[in-house]
Regions:
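Glycine/proline-rich, flexible active-site/cofactor-binding loop segments
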Residues: 25, 29-58
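Internal catalytic-core helix/loop-beta-alpha segment
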Residues: 81-123
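Conserved acidic residues
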Residues: 29, 85, 140
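PRPP-dependent phosphoribosyltransferase catalytic core
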Residues: 2-4, 105-159
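Short, well-ordered alpha-helices that flank and scaffold nucleotide-derived cofactor binding pockets
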Residues: 20, 43, 47, 105-109
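Short, glycine/charge-rich flexible loops or terminal/linker lids adjacent to PRPP-binding catalytic cores
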Residues: 15, 50-87, 98-103
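Active-site-facing substrate-recognition patch
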Residues: 1-28, 63
Length: 159
């Protein structure tokens, strides 16, 4: 399988690209990094926004069905904390869409719909998704780069 190798320098450029796409129409109260791949991208994007930052751990395994997602630790991400907030969700890659779909559902339901969401990723894989974030009216969506369906080798990946 071919790989797309990403350097730390690339991540800086990609985070600036996300900021430039998101900022004109959405200024978050909170940047939320989905771990573990979205933690560093969230920090880098938040260097531009300079707002509160939170992180969650969400894992998706096997055939990437929603039922296979390991329940995340939403720590202080509860309805009182997020209601009427603008939250920018950051992850490294949108592969099947399952993780983003889970997080959008969870946040939207916790806030009883009283929330503004924007999700952004470093790479959006150009393939069919289990969850089509582009057609979900509950959230805006941006990505820095469109990628082929190849392995994306981020600096934090073990080889």
């Amino acid at each position: 399988m071919s790989k797309l190798k990403i350097s730390y320098s690339d991540l800086d450029s990609l985070s600036k690209k996300i900021y430039d796409k998101v900022r004109p129409n959405f200024c978050p109260d909170i940047v939320l990094g989905i771990g573990s791949g979205g933690w560093l991208p969230a920090k880098l994007v938040n260097n531009h926004f300079n707002v509160e930052i939170e992180s969650i751990q969400v894992s998706c395994y096997n055939n990437r069905e929603l039922s296979n997602i390991v329940e995340s630790n939403f720590s202080k991400i509860n309805s009182n904390y997020i209601i009427n907030k603008k939250i920018l969700i950051i992850d490294d890659v949108n592969d099947t869409g399952t993780t983003l779909g889970y997080v959008v559902d969870k946040l939207y339901n916790l806030a009883c719909g009283e929330i503004e969401l924007c999700a952004a990723v470093m790479h959006h894989k150009d393939k069919e998704k289990k969850y089509d974030i582009l057609s979900d009216i509950r959230t805006r969506y941006e990505y820095a780069n469109l990628a082929d369906d190849v392995w994306i080798d981020y600096p934090w990946e073990s080889n």
